[in-house]
Amino acid sequence: MISSKPSKQRKLVYNLPNHLRYKLLTARLSEDLEKQYGIKRISIRKGDSVKLMRGSQVGYEGKVVEVDRKRGRVAIEGLTKKKADGTPVYVWVHASKVIITKLDTGDKERMDAIERKRKMREEYFSKKSPKEVS
């Protein structure tokens, strides 16, 4: 039996192994990408272009420079702040606070995964009746 206690759910996330943390690093696709690829969300990768949807920098667009699986956050090109000594450091943003505006399509395996997800989604919605979908 799986617990529904919030404290145990948080503990599960905190103690999750690194090779499973990529599942927490998913973000929605923009509307035009959603129509183009037929999926709603995908894991964020270095090289994707994203747009901030929450926080003080809302609307900022840039390329993902680094992904920190342990903290579940991404660094975006150009989104920096200065330390006390003047050196710039990245502002780390939680993956759920961004929308992917352009995918890095250089990896064939990723494109195969997108195609797999699209087919599964189409299959799922084709089985449901029109009344259940809406």
From Swiss-Prot:
Gene3D superfamilies: 2.30.30.30. SMART domains: KOW (SM00739). It comes from the Archaea. GO terms for molecular function: rRNA binding; structural constituent of ribosome. The keyword Cell cycle does not apply. InterPro entries: KOW, Rib_uL2_dom2, Ribosomal_uL24_euk/arc, Ribosomal_uL24_KOW, Translation_prot_SH3-like_sf. One of its GO terms (biological process) is translation. Keywords: Ribonucleoprotein, Ribosomal protein, RNA-binding, rRNA-binding. One of its GO terms (cellular component) is large ribosomal subunit. Belongs to the universal ribosomal protein uL24 family. Part of the 50S ribosomal subunit. One of two assembly initiator proteins, it binds directly to the 5'-end of the 23S rRNA, where it nucleates assembly of the 50S subunit. This is Large ribosomal subunit protein uL24. It comes from Sulfolobus acidocaldarius (strain ATCC 33909 / DSM 639 / JCM 8929 / NBRC 15157 / NCIMB 11770).
